[in-house]
Amino acid sequence: MRRIVQNNWSKLVAVALVLNLSITSCSFYEEDLKPSVSGEGVIKTESREVEAFSEIELETNATVYVTEGAETKVQVSAFGNLQPFVQTIVNGKTLIIDNKRSFRSEDQITIYITVPSVEKLTVRGAGKVISQGVLGTDHLALKVTGSGEIKVAADAETIKSDVDGSGTIEVAGHAYSQEVNISGSGKLLSYELLTEASQVQIGGSGNAFAQVAKKLDVKITGSGEVKYKGQPTVDTNITGTGRVSQLI
């Protein structure tokens, strides 16, 4: 009798687990099936109340303009019916910009951010982050995952740029040193960034363009290419058909 009860109890537990997993899966599935939202009405600009932050992470198809200023401000410009679906949440020291529902590509969302100091900018997907004016900071990190774009002017001690995918990072201004990592077919455009030393690493078919005064270290695995301005000493480590060339 005890064995029968135990077997029945085991079966009940198994059934409960299956039902729970089914309900959870259905919830996620229903969320994924929600249709995209189309912009309607007029464009509205809404100010968002947020906590202090020094890093920005864009996870949706939007264009973000970043300006350094004394006060922290976040303004979202979009069709009125899309405003509730645009999320601006601060997690730690990072402002995360995302959407609760997918939008049509033509319903472009524009976000204007003013912040005292910027330490890191990240784009995941196809969005864009553009600086208005020069970003002044000791260390600036830039990262694109996907086909997105970051375009900034900066005055920094060090700048670290990472591209994973087919995205583009474009940097102008001044930095003592620059570190670049490209994985895939992405691009780093830093012709207008004056650096003393730059370190570039490419895995894949990516391209990097740099202006270096003293020291350039290059490592390429694949068919990537590095072009540079200036008269630095150059150390190369190439596996594959990659190339390094000087622009006159």
Range-by-range predicted roles:
Residues 1-248:
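Intrinsically disordered, low-complexity terminal regions
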